[in-house]
Amino acid sequence: MLLDPEDWSLAQCAPEVLESLPPELVDHTDGETHRSTLELRSDPHPDAGSLCDQLMSLRHGLAAAVTARGMRAGAAGLHGCTTWADTKVTESPRYDIVHDSMRVLARREPTFGLHLHVGVTDREEAVRLSNRLRAHLPILLALSANSPFWQGRDTGMRSARTPLFQGFPRVGVPRAFADYRDWVEAVDVLVRCGAVPEPSFLWWDVRLQPRFGTVEVRVLDAQTEVADTMALVALFQSVSRLELLEGHTSERLLDSPEALAENRFLAARDGMDAALLDPAGGRLVPARDVLAELMEACAPHAEALGCAAELALVDELARSSGADRQLSLAREGGPSAAMAGLARAFLAPPPSELAPAPSKPEASRPASRPPAAA
């Protein structure tokens, strides 16, 4: 998000910033639906360490371009003080379609998400991974929760972005697909009937990206610091390998769309303080216990992928999420102080141990060799 340091409101200057970017940033920066929003896009990376280096470089380049215009850059799931009346939308062919179809929904306050991709080798594997990742969306959301304020108020939610974005169609947890043909047939109905022009207008929490050869997770709030992004990247990559090689998740949970949807809400409301439904045991389980068990299962996969140092950062994120830090800043200075904190933390360096990992031999990777991309 782009911020005006005069009062930490949203700055409506994304098109002007895009025109002033240096060449090395042009291919990695895009406008979004709102004029206060820019998207940074990484390249695919074989390991989390090299991704971390690029994300820091992109943030420094963007911050310099934004600061040259007297503004600042920040990142979170929502701007906690803005209202729909303060926002301006972007004009482009794609976003004209969004605005025309979404009407007032597309003109409300912008939401900011972190979208992660993992590479897979074939379409059937992509469907299988997408199906199984649905069970892990609540934990990923709880860890990433970074939007407690909306229109200047404490919402009582750790991720208010989640229910706000739910107002859009074609969002939330997708159904399980039997195979790639089943996925194609489901999407084809929407395209042939004119509901969407192409599959990227499906904004599910996890979705296939056939043109990239990836599975994409979209449930996450944008992260204020790169270190938090790297923790989520490592967990996502490790969980993907775990599911592809071991099929870790309970089939009972995967077969319960009601439990998956409820866990998503609980994670958005309570973050890591949530208690999540366990259909197999017929009970609620603290999210911290779910995470502890998952971290233990992921540890050998993180070692194989070269992201063990990044995965270790998950523990700190579980103790203090972006939402927790915003709430702490707001206790003394109100929500606007939390927005100022987003700008201060935008270039916070990651821990020094997060150096690019050495290349791993192919035998140590799963058949899918999932690269990480943010």
List each model region and its residues.
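C-terminal accessory/tail domains of diverse enzymes
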Residues: 1-69, 98, 165-361, 365, ...
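An acidic- and aromatic-residue-enriched active-site/binding cleft used to recognize and process polar
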Residues: 5, 43, 71, 76-81, ...
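Short, flexible active-site-proximal loops enriched in glycine and acidic residues
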Residues: 28-33, 66-79, 104-111
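Short, glycine/charge-rich beta-strand/loop segments that flank catalytic centers
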Residues: 70-87, 151-155
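Short, low-order "capping/linker" segments at domain edges
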Residues: 84-96, 155-171, 264
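Acidic, His- and aromatic-enriched active-site or binding-groove loops in soluble protein domains
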Residues: 92-113
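Internal, well-ordered domain-core segments that constitute the primary functional module
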Residues: 107-133
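An exposed, glycine/acidic-rich loop-and-rim segment of catalytic or binding clefts
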Residues: 122, 130-177
